[in-house]
Amino acid sequence: MGNVFVFDHPLIQHKLTYIRDKNTGTKEFRELVDEVAMLMAFEITRDLPVKEVNVDTPVTTAPSKVLAGKKLGLVPILRAGLGMVDGVRKLIPAAKVGHVGLYRDPETFKPVEYYVKLPNDIEEREIIVIDPMLATGGSANDAIAAIKKRGAKNIRLMCLIAAPEGVEVVKEAHPDVDIYLAAMDERLDDHGYIIPGLGDAGDRLFGTK
């Protein structure tokens, strides 16, 4: 069964407070999301394998460690997931980036797929699926399914916030996928929105309504 990790690092929680604040403007919101994504990436990559090497310093030769060649891929769910990609890439600049486009039908709350573009060698990569909000779990489920269908075997899901209902849906459908969060919120309301939430992440990132 996939694990759920909620990061309680003080910097993440401090910045998340201002991300939630309805008075935070688009520019600051975008910058805060970028910063939290970078901090979360630091935690998510904590278990990456390393290998021993020797490096020549200006003084002598020192035993050191480098990443053991593990390939990573980032797959934001369009469009809100785009707001977190640059923050992650600051720590993992060599990661390839794919995209999955989904929108939520306002009547059924179910996701509709309209775009999928992934790295050609996705089956060789550990994939981090990125979406700021995990609400009903439908979009994450469909995105993960689309990625698995194209050959990915190792997948993690990274979100700023989630509702317990959405987490359970993803865990049931994809028990092999670990979920990483900055916060677990209380619940979904009758319209499928996360409470207390942070509003519509895509609109707040891109200044749209």
UniProtKB/Swiss-Prot annotation:
Keywords recorded for this protein, A-Z: Allosteric enzyme, Glycosyltransferase, GTP-binding, Magnesium, Nucleotide-binding, Transferase
Domain of life from the UniProt record: Bacteria
Gene Ontology BP term (one): uracil salvage
Organism: Oceanobacillus iheyensis (strain DSM 14371 / CIP 107618 / JCM 11309 / KCTC 3954 / HTE831)
Pathway(s) annotated for this protein in UniProt: Pyrimidine metabolism; UMP biosynthesis via salvage pathway; UMP from uracil: step 1/1
Regulation acting on activity, per entry: Allosterically activated by GTP.
Catalytic activity reported: UMP + diphosphate = 5-phospho-alpha-D-ribose 1-diphosphate + uracil
HAMAP family: Upp_B
Annotated residues for binding of uracil: 194, 199-201
Keyword Nucleotide-binding: yes
Enzyme class per UniProt: transferase
Similarity field: Belongs to the UPRTase family.
Single Gene Ontology MF annotation: magnesium ion binding
Note accompanying the cofactor annotation: Binds 1 Mg(2+) ion per subunit. The magnesium is bound as Mg-PRPP.
Needed co-factor(s): Mg(2+)
Entry's transmembrane regions: none
UniProt key word GTP-binding: yes
E.C. code: 2.4.2.9
Binding site for 5-phospho-alpha-D-ribose 1-diphosphate: 79, 104, 131-139, 200
PANTHER family membership: ADENINE PHOSPHORIBOSYLTRANSFERASE, URACIL PHOSPHORIBOSYLTRANSFERASE, CHLOROPLASTIC
Function of the molecule: Catalyzes the conversion of uracil and 5-phospho-alpha-D-ribose 1-diphosphate (PRPP) to UMP and diphosphate.
Pfam families registered for this protein in UniProt: UPRTase
Family annotation (InterPro entries): PRibTrfase_dom, PRTase-like, Upp_B, UPRTase/APRTase, Ura_phspho_trans
The encoding gene: upp
Protein name: Uracil phosphoribosyltransferase
